[in-house]
């Protein structure tokens, strides 16, 4: 059985801010692109961290997890009302990369477009010929014009 509090290395009474901070630290640490020499372990840990954050950052999911543990997370416990809404408490986990992008605001900070826009390079930096305007892309770590 996986203990989500242990995965994020936070106490059971941790605030949502502490959970957010722990996720940020561990998601950056275990991101598969930052661990090319140990990719399998990094992917496994990255998924665990994202799953733990999804449950513990949502008040309703966290309450169910605190009451019923992993069985609640898997939909095995519904608080004594088994037929009221059988899907109400089933947790569905998203792709860890989606959780990471949502948390960090857009692009993956570890993937860089080294070639840029090939048409922009060929046309001498002018996208107006293509009928497009340049847009800025900003992440918490980098801002591209």
From Swiss-Prot:
Q: Which InterPro entries match?
A: DnaJ_domain, DnaJ_domain_CS, DNJB2/6-like, J_dom_sf
Function recorded in the entry: May operate as a co-chaperone of the male germ cell- and haploid stage-specific Hsp70 proteins.
Which parts of the sequence belong to the J domain? 1-69
Q: Name one GO molecular function term.
A: unfolded protein binding
Q: In which tissues is it expressed?
A: Expressed in sperm (at protein level).
Q: List the disulfide bonds.
A: none
* Pfam families assigned: DnaJ (PF00226)
Which GO terms of type biological process are on file?
chaperone-mediated protein folding
Q: What is this protein called?
A: DnaJ homolog subfamily B member 3
CDD domains, sorted: DnaJ
Q: Which organism is it from?
A: Homo sapiens (Human)
Per UniProt, the keywords (alphabetical) are: Chaperone
Query: Would the keyword Nucleus be found if you checked this record's keyword annotation?
Result: no
